[in-house]
Every structure is written in C-alpha cells, then in structure tokens.
Amino acid sequence: MAPAATAAAPRLLRAAMLLLLLVAAGRRAAGAPVVNELRCQCLQTLQGIHLKNIQSVKVTTPGPHCDQTEVIASLKTGQEVCLNPTAPMVKKIIDKMLNKASAN
C-alpha cells in the first residue's frame, strides 16, 4: 500500500464505526415510545349515556400518562365515548357495571 492510503485507513475505519453506531442508535430510538403517545385519551366527555347502549366500561386512574381519571365506555355499536367521571349519572353507570360484573 502507498503511504497515503495507509494513513487514510484508520480515518476511514473510524468514520465507518461512527456511522455504524449512529445507525444502531437511530434504529433503537425508532422503537422507543414517543412522548406524545403518553397523554390523556379523553379530550371531551359526556355527562352520561343510557346504560342499555353500553357494552363495557374502562376506568383509567391518574398516572404518569394523564393526571385525571378517565372513564371510557365501549358502546354496543363499537364506538367508544369518554364519560365525565364526576357526573352523577356516570357514577351510577360505573356502580351498576361493577355490580353486574361481581354478580357474574
């Protein structure tokens, strides 16, 4: 090899290793959860809905993703709606659904 080629080899190797590390770091970051996915699901809530339309209810307690309690009702039509957890009608719906689940 020529002296110039021998001197350039370590630089080329260093550049290739750096590129490999950057690609590996980029792929790892692509699989990490995005911060904006960790947010409240309910932007608007309903004060209530008729119990006969509800198939199931999911209550999400406050946590790092959202600082408020969320009540999400799955309707028999397949639609999901957010309910106001402090509304009296919603509290009754949750109680009835819990009693129904404990009876089964």
Curated annotation (Swiss-Prot):
InterPro entries listed in its UniProt record: Chemokine_b/g/d, Chemokine_CXC, Chemokine_CXC_CS, Chemokine_IL8-like_dom, CXC_Chemokine_domain, Interleukin_8-like_sf
For this chain, the annotated S-S bridges are: 40-66, 42-82
Q: Where are the transmembrane segments?
A: none
- Quick one: where is this thing mainly located? secreted
Which Gene3D superfamilies does the record match to this protein?
A: 2.40.50.40
> Which GO molecular function, any one, fits this protein according to its record?
growth factor activity
Q: Name one Pfam family in it.
A: IL8
Cite the entry's keywords alphabetically.
Answer: Cytokine, Disulfide bond, Growth factor, Inflammatory response, Secreted, Signal
Q: Does the keyword Membrane apply?
A: no
Secretion signal, residue range per the UniProt entry: 1-30
Which GO annotations describe the biological process of this protein? immune response; inflammatory response
Give the UniProt entry's GO cellular component terms: extracellular space
**Compartment list:** Secreted
CDD domains cross-referenced by the UniProt entry? Chemokine_CXC (cd00273)
Query: What family does this chain come from, according to its entry?
Result: Belongs to the intercrine alpha (chemokine CxC) family.
Protein name, as recorded: Growth-regulated protein homolog beta
Q: Report the source organism.
A: Bos taurus
